[in-house]
């Protein structure tokens, strides 16, 4: 083989020692998060969701599952989307255990609660992420357990029927506009599997649809991202690292905002 895509950290380390391959580092261009069902108790309480966000140490997640690689994010957008991305949101919920405990107390859960994290069993990185979160949430009295399910079951029970409490997955985009990642969280969207509902968010999206000014649209999308962050709609984690190994007698590999493998750009150098 001349190319290996989406390598694990172990595979990357092995191939990095092989002079026959060059490693290319980029982002996977998806929003990995602990997605929270906003209508299921106690996650229907914004203070509970915020507490979960403050309890997490996302850099530790990256360190433990990907040798520190990846980009911490704070809303449903990733860096490759450029003008739509709001980088400062990644600092909104820096780990603060005492603040998390206080929020739980205010929400009526001073002793914590039990949480089920449903994870598709064919994505090891999501399973590993869930395992790190389980340990981190213990610090605020939240007893989390992981429920692994087949991918088909995840699609039907979690995504379609919304029968879940929380889940770790990555959500990507099909096209290059803010709409691709943000429309799904409007209250009536069939893709709104977390049951997020915010009238202001819906109004902002309607403004986007009627606006013909690109700069205005970008600012509206940024406001939507900020609302998702402020409401702790989900516990946002990262745009996972994407590493590709290309045999050294080839060059020209490129990363794109969407997941594509543009083989036409690769050329032989020897």
Q: Across the structure, where does each feature detected by a protein language model lie?
A:
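Ligand-binding "clamshell"
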Residues: 12-25, 161-164, 177-192, 248-251
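Ligand/substrate-recognition segments at binding pockets and active sites
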Residues: 105-173, 188, 214, 242
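Extracellular/periplasmic solute-recognition and catalytic clefts
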Residues: 1-40
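Long beta-strand-rich cores associated with HINT superfamily self-processing modules
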Residues: 244-270
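Structural transition elements
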Residues: 71-106, 124-126
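Extracytoplasmic/peripheral linker and loop segments enriched in polar/acidic and small residues
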Residues: 47, 145-154, 160, 180-248, ...
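Periplasmic-binding protein-like
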Residues: 25-36, 39, 43-82, 188-202, 228-236
């Amino acid at each position: 083989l001349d190319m290996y895509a989406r390598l694990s950290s172990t595979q990357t380390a092995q191939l990095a020692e092989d002079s026959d391959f060059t490693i290319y580092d980029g982002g996977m261009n998806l929003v990995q998060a602990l997605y929270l069902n906003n209508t299921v108790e106690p996650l229907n309480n914004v203070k509970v969701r915020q507490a979960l966000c403050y309890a997490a140490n996302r850099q530790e997640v990256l360190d433990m599952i990907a040798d520190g690689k990846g980009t911490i994010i704070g809303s449903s957008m990733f860096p490759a989307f450029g003008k739509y991305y709001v980088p400062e949101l990644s600092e909104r919920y820096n780990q603060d255990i005492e603040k998390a405990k206080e929020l739980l107390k205010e929400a009526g859960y001073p002793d914590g609660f039990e949480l089920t994290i449903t994870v598709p069993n064919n994505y090891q990185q999501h399973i590993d992420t869930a395992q790190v979160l389980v340990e981190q949430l213990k610090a605020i009295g939240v007893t989390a357990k992981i429920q692994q399910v087949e991918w088909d079951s995840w699609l039907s029970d979690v995504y379609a029927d919304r029968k879940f409490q929380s889940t770790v997955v990555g959500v990507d985009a099909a096209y290059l506009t803010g709409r691709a990642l943000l429309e799904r969280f409007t209250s009536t969207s069939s893709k709104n599997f977390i049951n997020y509902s915010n009238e202001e968010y819906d109004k902002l999206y309607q403004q986007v649809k009627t606006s013909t000014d690109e700069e205005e649209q970008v600012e509206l999308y940024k406001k939507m991202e900020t609302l998702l962050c402020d409401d702790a709609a989900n516990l946002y984690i990262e745009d996972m690292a994407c590493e590709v190994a290309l045999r050294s007698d080839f060059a020209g590999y490129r990363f794109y905002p969407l997941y594509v493998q543009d083989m036409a750009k690769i050329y032989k150098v020897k």
